[in-house]
Curated annotation (Swiss-Prot):
<dbReference type="GO" id="GO:0004467">
    <property type="term" value="F:long-chain fatty acid-CoA ligase activity"/>
</dbReference>
<comment type="function">
    <text>Mediates the import of long-chain fatty acids (LCFA) into the cell by facilitating their transport at the plasma membrane. Also functions as an acyl-CoA ligase catalyzing the ATP-dependent formation of fatty acyl-CoA using LCFA and very-long-chain fatty acids (VLCFA) as substrates, which prevents fatty acid efflux from cells and might drive more fatty acid uptake. May act directly as a bona fide transporter, or alternatively, in a cytoplasmic or membrane-associated multimeric protein complex to trap and draw fatty acids towards accumulation.</text>
</comment>
<keyword id="KW-0963">Cytoplasm</keyword>
<keyword id="KW-0443">Lipid metabolism</keyword>
<keyword id="KW-0276">Fatty acid metabolism</keyword>
<dbReference type="InterPro" id="IPR042099">
    <property type="entry name" value="ANL_N_sf"/>
</dbReference>
<dbReference type="GO" id="GO:0005789">
    <property type="term" value="C:endoplasmic reticulum membrane"/>
</dbReference>
<keyword id="KW-1133">Transmembrane helix</keyword>
<feature type="topological domain" description="Extracellular">
    <location>
        <begin position="1"/>
        <end position="13"/>
    </location>
</feature>
<dbReference type="GO" id="GO:0005886">
    <property type="term" value="C:plasma membrane"/>
</dbReference>
<dbReference type="Pfam" id="PF00501">
    <property type="entry name" value="AMP-binding"/>
</dbReference>
<dbReference type="GO" id="GO:0000166">
    <property type="term" value="F:nucleotide binding"/>
</dbReference>
<feature type="topological domain" description="Cytoplasmic">
    <location>
        <begin position="35"/>
        <end position="646"/>
    </location>
</feature>
<dbReference type="GO" id="GO:0001676">
    <property type="term" value="P:long-chain fatty acid metabolic process"/>
</dbReference>
<feature type="binding site">
    <location>
        <begin position="246"/>
        <end position="257"/>
    </location>
    <ligand>
        <name>AMP</name>
    </ligand>
</feature>
<dbReference type="GO" id="GO:0031957">
    <property type="term" value="F:very long-chain fatty acid-CoA ligase activity"/>
</dbReference>
<keyword id="KW-1003">Cell membrane</keyword>
């Protein structure tokens, strides 16, 4: 930030001039001159440009910390905090189901969750037991996990897109004693019924066909109607540091892991979002994200449970209905994630775009290449982009609308929030260390792995990990900031500019080297998607026998078979460096995404450019001819043997 000697020299000159008998005003002016001349002007420039931002960020940090400590001392839980909201505004709308039109007041949500708590207590479920929820996003979903929490029972929130082995895996690792599933997912449960333990108690909620319920399944809704809606006579003795529920990671890099969400983490995520973007109690938030993930269930629904906002739920994102819903329900805040903003831009212009009242869009994953296009077309005044995995302790937020930034860390007071970018081996992603064995901090403009110092006594810095202890240990490094400390490894590469703004580069493993250069998959995906009219694109590196590094491969959604590889190549030559241009193309009906609209690359990377692994159309870039050629088994063999120079 500034030369280490600048400050020392200025202080020394101040003392020397004072000893010589000069007035303090003269001495101070001279010392300031030495400081500025020694490079301190850079620091003063940073102070002038970021002080307002940093003060606001500091106020948010202090406010959240004080609130958390107050709730910790009082041993409050999320259900108890919600109870206070209910008492203030029992008849206000809490949740609205945009699909069915159902509207739940805070009093109704409280009554439903009380019935859930009483029912499971009566059935013998004890604090610390786990119940899995497999249901699409609707008010009952929220009432279920909230009611279980009132009884001290921990919910495992299952991804509704999982089937068979992956679904059985997640259910098994949760240690659940019961499964509550929606009638709309009865067929998925039936598919794996043979893998479910006989001791697992099963409940079905919602509408279900005559063949949808198996003999050992109980209908939940009639049971709840017969159960008292009064608060539990003896609430569990839980606190903010106890487990609330489990959220499974999206599985973009393998099988999902069950992240532990304690009450304080739920509060922290919701509170940071609330204060960072100045949400108000009168706001109406539109939440079309999955409720089995943290963005929809904590950042979104948390505004309802903790701060009393009305939240409009839609079980599945619909680009064509998005703005109509916002107009219908007078939404002022919307959520996005992954590629949602790009999908909205692909839609034809609609009348509702100009009639909505949305002032704020909160989420993560908005590509810098479409940031301003999104705000200008839809008239959304503020983008609340943030960075943070469900389980991480190093979340950051873009509080002042800096285009493309995921958030910031203060350059003036960097130690107030102990996160850091550290150097890693670009090929193996191993941490690089100095002679003292500590991690090496990155300089401004230098990409590095984001890490957060762990302090289990501090709710803002604790890391609760996963159900799997081995998975937890893999995310922790030691002697990072100082000897013997522990830090959370985010797995994501970011870069920080001179003012402390951070920009997302790649998830570890998504940057690869080719021809001695680093290729950023995020950058190439953004370019390709823009050239192709916001089409879904997945970019990844593939190994080629006998060739150093990894070659760039792009999987492109081409459901109608209209894409011309060579017309695309003509455009790529204008905007991408030679080393970043895809060597291989795969044209397929659709690119797989996770439930949170993140591109799913695991299967694509595994299959590579081998035509035996797929029936999709494959092409390779013949550099001699200067265009793409079809890739069949014969060509594949020649490439692997080195007959074709890449």
């Amino acid at each position: 930030m500034r030369a280490p000697g600048a400050g020392s020299a200025s202080v020394a000159s101040l003392v020397l001039l004072w000893l010589l008998g000069l007035p303090w005003t003269w001495s101070t002016a001279a010392a300031l001159g030495v400081y500025v001349g020694g490079g301190g002007w850079r620091f003063l420039r940073i102070v002038c440009k970021t002080a307002r931002r940093d003060l606001f960020g500091l106020s948010v940090l202090i406010r959240v910390r004080l609130e958390l400590r107050r709730h910790q001392r009082a041993r409050h839980t999320i259900p108890q905090i919600f109870q206070a909201v209910v008492q203030r505004q029992p008849e206000r709308l809490a949740l609205v189901d945009a699909g069915s039109g159902a509207c739940w007041t805070f009093a109704q949500l409280d009554a439903y969750s009380n019935a859930v708590a009483n029912l499971f207590r009566r059935l013998g479920f004890a604090p610390g037991d786990v119940v899995a929820i497999f249901m699409e996003g609707r008010p009952e979903f929220v009432g279920l996990w909230l009611g279980l929490a009132k009884a001290g029972v921990e919910a495992a929130l299952l991804n509704v897109n999982l089937r068979r082995e992956p679904l059985a895996f997640c259910l098994g690792t949760s240690g659940a004693k019961a499964l509550v599933f929606g009638g709309e997912l009865a067929a998925a449960v039936a598919e794996m019924s043979g893998e479910l333990g006989k001791s697992l108690v099963k409940f079905c909620s919602g509408d279900v066909g005559p063949d949808g319920v198996f003999p050992d399944t109980q209908l939940l809704d009639p049971l709840l109607k017969e159960t008292s809606t009064a608060p539990l006579a003896q609430p569990p003795g839980k606190g903010m540091d106890d487990r609330l529920f489990y959220i499974y990671t999206s599985g973009t890099t393998g099988l999902p892991k069950a992240a532990i969400i304690v009450h304080s983490r739920y509060y922290r995520i919701a509170a940071f979002g609330h204060y960072s973007y100045s949400m108000q109690a009168a706001d109406v938030l539109y939440d079309c994200l999955p409720l089995y993930h943290s963005a929809g269930n904590i950042m979104g629904v948390g505004q309802c449970l903790i701060y009393g906002l009305t939240v409009v739920l839609r079980k599945k994102f619909s680009a064509s209905r998005f703005w109509d819903d916002c107009v219908k329900y007078n939404c002022t805040v919307v959520q996005y994630i992954g590629e949602i903003c790009r999908y909205l831009l692909k839609q034809p212009v609609r009348e509702a775009e100009g009639r909505h009242r949305v002032r704020l869009a909160v989420g993560n994953g908005l590509r810098p290449s479409i940031w301003e296009e999104f705000t200008e077309r839809f008239g959304v005044r503020q983008i609340g982009e943030f960075y943070g995995a469900t389980e991480c302790n190093c979340s950051i937020a873009n509080m002042d609308g800096k285009v493309g930034s995921r958030g910031f860390n203060s350059r003036i007071l960097p130690h107030v929030y102990p996160i850091r970018l550290v150097k890693v081996n670009e090929d193996t992603m191993e941490l690089l260390r100095d002679a003292q064995g500590l991690c090496i901090p990155c300089q401004t403009g230098e990409p590095g792995l984001l890490v957060g110092q762990i302090n289990q006594q501090d709710p803002l810095r604790r890391f609760d990990g996963y159900i799997s202890e081995s998975a937890t240990s893999k995310k922790i490094a030691h002697s990072v900031f100082r000897k013997g400390d522990s830090a959370y490894l985010s797995g994501d590469v970011l870069v920080m500019d001179e003012l402390g703004y951070m920009y997302f580069r790649d998830r570890s493993g998504d940057t690869f080297r080719w021809r001695g250069e680093n290729v950023s998959t995020t950058e190439v995906e953004g370019v390709l998607s823009r050239l192709l009219g916001q089409t879904d694109v997945a970019v990844y590196g593939v190994a080629v026998p006998g060739v150093e590094g990894k070659a760039c491969m792009a999987a492109i959604a081409d459901p109608h078979g209209r894409l011309s590889p060579n017309a695309l190549y003509e455009e790529l030559q204008k905007v991408l460096a030679p080393y970043a241009r895809p060597i291989f193309l795969r044209l397929l009906p659709q690119v797989d995404t996770t439930g949170t609209f993140k591109i799913q690359k695991t299967r694509l990377q595994h299959e590579g450019f081998d035509p035996r692994q797929t029936s999709d159309r494959l092409f390779f870039l013949d550099l001699k001819q200067g265009h793409y050629l079809p890739l069949d088994q014969g060509v594949y063999t020649r490439i692997c043997s080195g007959a074709f120079a890449l």
